[in-house]
Swiss-Prot record:
It is a multi-pass membrane protein. One of its GO terms (biological process) is calcium ion transmembrane transport. It is found in: Plastid, Chloroplast membrane. PROSITE patterns: UPF0016 (PS01214). The chain crosses the membrane at residues 110-130, 149-169, 177-197, 207-227, 269-289, 311-331, 339-359. This is Protein PAM71-homolog, chloroplastic. Residues 1-66 form a transit peptide. Residues 85-98 have a biased composition (Low complexity).
Length: 359
């Protein structure tokens, strides 16, 4: 028994010595004294960080999780770069996808109206052509007053005061706003002129007479403006003054329009409604009492009001678009004498056509 107990004590003592020696080996104790890097104590998992996104992204099913820039061990710096590049690629991919999924803008309202009107005109022309042939189409257009109104208004407005007012305003403000304001004024003026002409046309019915007073008044007005346009063109000097200098007889239409715009629109406008109103008011009051207005009155008294109104508005539209797109450029090449002669000749031609019942 004593031998057994002694052997057990010896074994336990040897085990204790062995453990103590193992715990205190020289190289292990030396390793404990060496500085240990802090990166070895970092957790080996990558913490996740969520960013709150707008509701719009959540509706489209976009949810993004980005890992932090923390790395493990000696590769922490390169790992941060990889995470940064990954996050940048994640940042760029929703932008490109949102651009590809961006819906197209609505179809322009003014362009849709123009297409509808053009389609209606083509359908009407096709029906008339099928029923009566090409001659019926030309007769319908001629009798409606559209051709006469379009020709007279277009020639009268080229180089007119309202033409240059629209051109000068378009150089300062948005062209679309200037076009809308100018066409609003010209359309209203055209409708008023046609209504006045219709009133003159109804005068003979009130006096119970068969004498076409309205047509005679229209012929007189057309002849008056034709002769006046030719006389004004004759009185102009052969070489017009440039850069706003006076000719000794009168200021040109461009100079008058420039003075009017400087006086009435000297303050720079930023509100779209103010630009619309300024374009409307300047063109409306410049057009009031002009030869194109009185020519519309004369045509409205002698021909179909609807055809005259549509032709006059179409002529105003074409002339105003030309003024806005390149009126200042055309001002250097437009001859006021030539415009006066051509306009006067057209007035006389349509006066004779109205007298003989061609239109």
């Amino acid at each position: 028994m004593k031998l057994t107990s002694l052997s057990k004590n010896a074994n336990s003592t040897a085990t204790a010595v062995t453990v103590s020696s193992i715990q205190k080996l020289p190289f292990l104790s030396l390793s404990e004294t060496l500085p240990c890097p802090k990166s070895s104590r970092k957790p080996t998992f990558l913490p996740l960080r969520c960013r709150r996104r707008p509701k719009l992204d959540l509706l489209w099913g976009k949810f993004r999780v980005r890992a932090s820039d923390a790395g493990v061990g000696s590769g922490s710096y390169s790992g941060g770069e990889e995470d940064g590049s990954q996050s940048s690629s994640l940042d760029q991919s929703p932008a490109t996808s949102s651009e590809s999924l961006k819906p197209r803008g609505p179809f322009p309202y003014s362009l849709s109206i123009a297409l509808v009107l053009l389609s209606c005109g083509l359908v009407f022309s096709l029906i008339t052509f099928v029923k009566g042939g090409p001659s019926s189409v030309l007769a319908a257009v001629a009798k409606s007053g559209f051709t006469a109104a379009f020709s007279l208004i277009f020639v009268s407005e080229i180089g007119d005061k309202t033409f240059f007012i629209a051109a000068l305003l378009a150089m300062q403000y948005e062209k679309t706003l200037v076009l809308l304001g100018s066409m609003g004024a010209l359309s209203l003026m055209t409708i008023l002129s046609v209504v006045i002409g219709k009133i003159f046309q109804s005068v003979p019915a009130q006096f119970q007479t068969t004498l076409p007073i309205g047509e005679y008044a229209a012929i007189a007005l057309l002849m008056f403006f034709g002769l006046k346009s030719i006389k004004d063109a004759w009185d102009l000097p052969p070489v017009e003054a440039k850069n706003g200098e006076e000719t000794g007889i009168e200021l040109g239409e461009y100079s008058e329009a420039e003075e009017l715009v400087k006086e009435k629109a000297s303050k720079k406008l930023t509100n779209p409604l103010e630009i619309l109103w300024k374009s409307f008011s300047l063109v409306f009051f410049a057009e009031w009492g002009d030869r194109s207005m009185l020519a519309t009155v004369a045509l409205g008294a002698a021909q179909s009001p609807l055809g005259v109104a549509s032709g006059a508005i179409a002529g105003h539209l074409v002339a105003t678009v030309l003024a806005i797109m390149g009126g200042a450029f055309l001002a250097n090449y437009i001859s006021e004498k030539l415009v006066g002669y051509v306009g006067g000749a057209l007035f006389l031609v349509f006066a004779a056509a109205t007298f003989f019942g061609v239109f």
